[in-house]
């Protein structure tokens, strides 16, 4: 193994040391929380040791693809498929920070790729992981910047690529406040494939060399809906027998309460309407089910195989099926936006050609939402009452509903192409 002899400045070494010590100090509490949460969800305890870098040894040419959770894993899928087609001899190792992210990856790829939890960002965990996985390159989806991960990859001359990279102005200012730590890490990145010019400018501003930054667009526009997903959506839609259906996907916390309240109002004008409610995190499944029943609504749970035909709320309490559930719906609300979570990916429902709703908080997907807004493929709502009014209105106006959905799909189609640029960029740099 060859090591890069480049040295960081003394200030960065001190800050790196302080950062690593802080991570070491809080690690026992992180593991305790993992064990505690595992009482209710035993899967959280499974393979916990992988988070300390103890993963199965890999052989051959290993491409390490890291995606923090479900959304980033879905975004990585077309890229992974393309890399496997163009380089059938490589081994793809997919990692995620969450069990939901790994579950999504397994659902999409089966035994085509290898899987592991991403190691916590301590020097020891990263070292053990790299010793065992021995990756040829590291591909990070979006902006998961972990100092020890990137620093040790540089030391081992493992190129680090940030793909579909985005950086908000708020995050850029945060990195500027710790320039002594951030700049050397940014200079260790081999290539940044930014979603938009403003993202590229911010990465250059915080230390990435201009020659290593390219604007490729967002690979999320290259949304890929497999035929088996389309078939499953058609089957579910057939079961719903022409009912007006709206879906709220990737919802958070008390946002679920607001959506249930909105559906109660929708039912006043459309008594046969169905809400498909899909919380972002599994630990919200039970509270959402209880809240639904408390409001006097008829509930069906997908995890239990219950028939949604007679239900008023269909709880999507399974993993990896959100894309299919979008396809069985007439309208879609994308969660994390009625509260200050920054929203989630609106291109998943837009790829089905259905109207998209969002609350006012979509700063995590600002560029994508702006393109949808420019072409009137998304409707913004201020609160639950506003959402209920818009949903009810579009249920009554088939022509307008179809027009908005087609505009959303057109935005997706005309912005495709980032995937080819990203895959070509990775291959030519390896």
Label each residue range with its predicted role:
Residues 7-430:
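Nucleotide-activated sugar donor-binding and catalytic core shared by glycosyltransferases
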């Amino acid at each position: 193994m060859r090591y890069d002899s480049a040295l960081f400045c003394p200030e960065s070494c001190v800050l790196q040391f302080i950062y690593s010590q802080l991570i070491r100090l809080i690690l026992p509490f992180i593991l305790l929380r993992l064990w505690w949460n595992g009482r209710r969800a035993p899967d959280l305890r499974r393979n916990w040791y992988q988070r300390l870098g103890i993963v199965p040894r890999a052989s051959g040419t290993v491409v390490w693809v890291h995606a923090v959770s479900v959304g980033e894993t879905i975004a990585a899928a077309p890229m992974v498929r393309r890399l496997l087609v163009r380089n059938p001899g490589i081994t793809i190792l997919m990692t995620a920070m969450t069990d939901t992210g790994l579950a999504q990856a397994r659902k999409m790829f089966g035994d085509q790729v290898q899987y592991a939890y991403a190691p916590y960002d301590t020097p020891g965990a990263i070292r053990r992981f790299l010793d065992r996985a021995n990756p040829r390159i590291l591909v990070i989806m979006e902006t998961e910047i972990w100092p020890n991960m990137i620093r040790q990859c540089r030391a081992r001359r493992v190129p680090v690529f940030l793909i579909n990279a985005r950086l908000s102005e708020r995050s850029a200012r945060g990195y500027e406040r710790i320039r002594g730590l951030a700049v050397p890490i940014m200079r260790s990145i081999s290539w940044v494939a930014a979603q938009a010019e403003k993202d590229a400018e911010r990465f250059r501003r915080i230390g990435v060399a201009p020659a290593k930054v390219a604007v490729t667009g967002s690979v999320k526009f290259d949304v890929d809906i497999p035929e088996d997903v389309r078939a499953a959506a058609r089957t579910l839609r057939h079961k719903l027998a022409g009912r007006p259906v709206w879906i709220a996907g990737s919802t958070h916390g008390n946002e679920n309460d607001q959506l249930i309240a909105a559906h109660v109002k929708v039912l006043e004008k459309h008594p046969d309407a169905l809400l498909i409610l899909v919380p972002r995190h599994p630990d919200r499944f039970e509270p959402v089910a209880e809240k639904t029943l408390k409001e006097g609504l008829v509930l069906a749970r997908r995890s239990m195989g219950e028939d949604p035909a007679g239900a008023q709320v269909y709880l999507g309490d399974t993993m990896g099926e959100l894309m299919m559930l979008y396809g069985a719906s007439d309208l879609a609300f994308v969660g994390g936006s009625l509260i200050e979570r920054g929203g989630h990916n609106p291109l998943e429902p837009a790829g089905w050609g259905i109207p998209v709703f969002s609350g006012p908080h979509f700063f995590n997907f600002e560029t994508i939402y702006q393109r949808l807004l420019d072409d009137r493929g998304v409707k913004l709502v201020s609160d639950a009452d506003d959402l209920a009014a818009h949903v009810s209105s579009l249920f009554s106006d088939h022509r307008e509903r179809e027009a908005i959905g087609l505009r959303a799909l057109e935005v997706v189609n005309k912005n495709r192409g980032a995937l080819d640029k990203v895959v070509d960029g990775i291959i030519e740099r390896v």
